Amino acid sequence: MARNKIALIGSGMIGGTLAHLAGLKELGDIVLFDIADGIPQGKGLDIAQSSPVEGFDANLTGASDYSAIEGADVCIVTAGVPRKPGMSRDDLLGINLKVMEQVGAGIKKYAPNAFVICITNPLDAMVWALQKFSGLPANKVVGMAGVLDSSRFRLFLAKEFNVSVQDVTAFVLGGHGDTMVPLARYSTVGGIPLTDLVTMGWVTKERLEEIIQRTRDGGAEIVGLLKTGSAYYAPAASAIEMAESYLKDKKRVLPCAAHLTGQYGVKDMYVGVPTVIGAGGVERVIEIDLNKTEKEAFDKSVAAVAGLCEACINIAPALK
């Protein structure tokens, strides 16, 4: 049986980490692509040389021509410029929109049947533009954000309560940025909602709000520490979880930036919501009830994403 083919478009820190993780999980053969000739080839060879030690079978190749991604089952897009200290994700819009146009054309020509996961920032606007540039069905193009944001929230909660991360579930809605909406009411420790843990005296409302704010600032905190780039281990792990759910038809319930067609009162936009990912791509968008405060926060986040999409249209009118 032929192995799956995974194309990694962008071979920077996230791209290299994606290749290593995909190899370790034996998700398929891996092609690293980058316009910087030599980088994808070198990283591919380096990771391939780790396979006898780590005991995985996968062909890893690198290329600087889009024809190398031909027939890919999954494309994970990290191409673009990363954040530097003092920058918001939104500051990257103009540069990375042009990159998405090139990537979209490459996927359209060589991998029109792929499941596409976008990681490039500003995420919600870039995945929206990428879907339009590629012409792929909206359920086959998705943005990696919610899995990462929820993972950060879960870690901070586990540390606060001194429990295993495996026993913490967390929900983050909305855009992948300063207006994201971590939902305490739908987040649990051992099945107990955070709101109940406040009542039980495990944590104060004020401390919980501090953890929520740290989650919102999670990416910026790492950018500030690294000084020369942005996070890559956790984003790569998050995208691989999504790719695995698609390739193995696991039907995982994962929060991600999905195309909405009226759910949550949003049309023709990509916003972070809980989804079911299986062999059909995004097979279902799960609509949860939001109270007044949560709805206001979500609507504010949606408005921020809408503003970015409008900015994209001003740069590339063909997106309208």
Swiss-Prot record:
Top-level division of the source organism's lineage: Bacteria
CDD domains tied to this protein: LDH-like_MDH
Broad enzyme group: oxidoreductase
EC number: 1.1.1.37
Disulfide bonds: none
Record-level Gene Ontology MF annotations: L-lactate dehydrogenase activity; L-malate dehydrogenase (NAD+) activity
Entry binding sites for NAD(+): G10, S11, G12, M13, I14, G15, D34, N96, I119, T120, N121
Residues annotated as binding substrate: R83, R89, N121, R152
Keyword check for Oxidoreductase: yes
Keywords noted in UniProt: NAD, Oxidoreductase, Tricarboxylic acid cycle
Gene3D superfamilies: Lactate dehydrogenase/glycoside hydrolase, family 4, C-terminal, NAD(P)-binding Rossmann-like Domain
InterPro entries reported for this sequence: L-lactate/malate_DH, Lactate/malate_DH_C, Lactate/malate_DH_N, Lactate_DH/Glyco_Ohase_4_C, Malate_DH_type3, NAD(P)-bd_dom_sf
Biological processes per GO annotation: lactate metabolic process; tricarboxylic acid cycle
Catalytic residue positions: H176 (proton acceptor)
Cited Pfam families: Ldh_1_C, Ldh_1_N
Reactions catalysed according to its record: (S)-malate + NAD(+) = oxaloacetate + NADH + H(+)
Reported function: Catalyzes the reversible oxidation of malate to oxaloacetate.
NCBIfam families reported in the protein's UniProt record: MalateDH_bact, PRK06223.1
Family per similarity comment: Belongs to the LDH/MDH superfamily. MDH type 3 family.
Protein name: Malate dehydrogenase
